[in-house]
């Protein structure tokens, strides 16, 4: 993951329009699935989108080394989301086993447990 763009009003009922920018540092011999989670500080996942990259049209095994791949996702903040802090996290996993790909450069990324990246944190207030 070399970058992302996020568009939203960050209010209950709003969409989270997320564009991820991936770049393969080496040839990938397996096809991974991308996961995107909206998780509250209570540990509950309130929105989730797991999908092969580019809606399945461009599997990771076909990525060329150095090529930048643009990958869009839409999640929605539930209308009844409780007032608390939230984090949007992303990562990759093997669909057959569920094993997540480890993050290699945690200094450059906001790693959350070594197998996902915390992209953005925000609060939803009361009322």
Give residue spans per PLM region.
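C-terminal luminal/periplasmic domains and tails of membrane-associated envelope-modifying transferases
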Residues: 1-127
């Amino acid at each position: 993951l070399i970058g992302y763009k996020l568009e939203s009003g960050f209010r209950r009922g709003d969409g989270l329009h997320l564009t991820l920018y991936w770049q393969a540092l080496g040839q990938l011999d397996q096809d991974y699935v991308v996961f995107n989670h909206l998780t509250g500080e209570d540990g509950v996942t309130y929105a989730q989108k797991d999908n092969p990259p580019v809606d399945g049209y461009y599997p990771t095994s076909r990525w060329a080394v150095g090529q930048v791949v643009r990958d869009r996702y839409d999640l929605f903040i539930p209308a009844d989301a409780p007032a608390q802090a939230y984090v949007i996290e992303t990562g990759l996993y093997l669909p057959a086993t569920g094993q997540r790909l480890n993050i290699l450069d945690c200094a450059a990324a906001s790693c959350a447990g070594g197998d996902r990246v915390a992209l953005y944190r925000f609060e939803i207030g009361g009322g």
